[in-house]
């Protein structure tokens, strides 16, 4: 990122900049490392919006020295099980795909081997949306000046924020519709239960009346 100079630098980031970081910073970048034992499977899941570019880089450190025929399989799927990326005997590489729908995506690493083998160290760096775009490459292809590149980045950032707000509004409307539907069902069920209780109470009154008449306890 380009640095600020002058009075703005002393004042620190403004509310709008903090909002950008809050909305896009944590959600568009996933950088994680973990240990993967032999003959085990670990998966990471993340919800990603529709029509977003997703890029990633991974590196798997093999500390076994090739012993035990250790192999690691990397597979990326959506909630329907469609394979977006797959790599047998993965060690180091990159991947990229574009989402077609808002969905939950799963990145799985599976290790297979024999014998006592040290755990593998897996490093995964995954980005999507604005963070996934290579603006240096875009600048070269479109012959953009540095200022134009920053303007393009801000334009994409603004569009992403607008899409996030639109999605949150849509989810809010869906949740409100669900709540209204649930309240309506609860109301109907309450009315039905009330009529059932009234009917049961009426039946009990007539039944007891006939019973007492049969026993000649009442006329």
UniProtKB/Swiss-Prot annotation:
Cellular component GO terms, alphabetical: COPI-coated vesicle; endoplasmic reticulum membrane; endoplasmic reticulum-Golgi intermediate compartment; endoplasmic reticulum-Golgi intermediate compartment membrane; gamma-secretase complex; Golgi membrane; melanosome; plasma membrane
Residue window of motif COPII vesicle coat-binding: 211-212
Main subcellular location: endoplasmic reticulum
Dimethylated arginine: residues bearing it: 171, 176
GO terms (BP aspect): COPI-coated vesicle budding; cytosol to ERGIC protein transport; Golgi organization; intracellular protein transport; positive regulation of interleukin-1 production; positive regulation of protein secretion; protein localization to ERGIC; regulated exocytosis
Region (Interaction with ARF1 and IL1B): 207-219
UniProt xrefs under SMART domains: EMP24_GP25L (SM01190)
Protein name per UniProt: Transmembrane emp24 domain-containing protein 10
Gene: TMED10
Ranges facing Lumenal side: 32-185
Entry comment, domain topic: The GOLD domain is required for proper p24 heterooligomeric complex formation and efficient transport of GPI-anchored proteins. The lumenal domain mediates localization to the plasma membrane by partially overriding the ER retention by the cytoplasmic domain.
PROSITE patterns: GOLD
Family of this protein: Belongs to the EMP24/GP25L family.
Keywords: Cell membrane, Cytoplasmic vesicle, Endoplasmic reticulum, ER-Golgi transport, Glycoprotein, Golgi apparatus, Membrane, Methylation, Protein transport, Signal, Transmembrane, Transmembrane helix, Transport
Glycosylation sites: 179
Motif (COPI vesicle coat-binding): 211-219
Source taxon at top rank: Eukaryota
UniProt region (Required for TMED10 and TMED2 cis-Golgi network localization), positions on chain: 147-178
Signal peptide: 1-31
PANTHER family named in the record: TRANSMEMBRANE EMP24 DOMAIN-CONTAINING PROTEIN
């Amino acid at each position: 990122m380009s640095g600020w100079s002058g009075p703005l630098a002393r004042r620190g980031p403004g509310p709008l900049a903090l909002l950008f970081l809050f909305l896009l910073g944590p959600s568009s970048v996933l950088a994680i490392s973990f240990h993967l034992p032999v003959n085990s499977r670990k998966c990471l899941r993340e919800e990603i919006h529709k029509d977003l570019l997703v890029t990633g880089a991974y590196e798997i450190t093999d500390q076994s020295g090739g012993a035990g025929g250790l192999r690691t399989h990397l597979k990326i799927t959506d909630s329907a099980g469609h394979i977006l990326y797959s790599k047998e005997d993965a060690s180091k590489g990159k991947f990229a795909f574009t989402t077609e729908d808002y969905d939950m995506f799963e990145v799985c690493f599976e290790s297979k081997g024999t014998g006592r083998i040290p755990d593998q160290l897996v490093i995964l760096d995954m980005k999507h949306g604005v963070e996934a775009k290579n603006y240096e490459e875009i600048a070269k292809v479109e012959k953009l000046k540095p200022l134009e590149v920053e303007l393009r980045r801000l334009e994409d950032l603004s569009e992403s924020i607008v899409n996030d707000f639109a999605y949150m509004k849509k989810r809010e409307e869906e949740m409100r519709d669900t709540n209204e539907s649930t309240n309506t069902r609860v109301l109907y069920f309450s009315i039905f239960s009330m009529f059932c209780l009234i009917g049961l109470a009426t039946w009990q009154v007539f039944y007891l009346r006939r019973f007492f008449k049969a026993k000649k306890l009442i006329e």
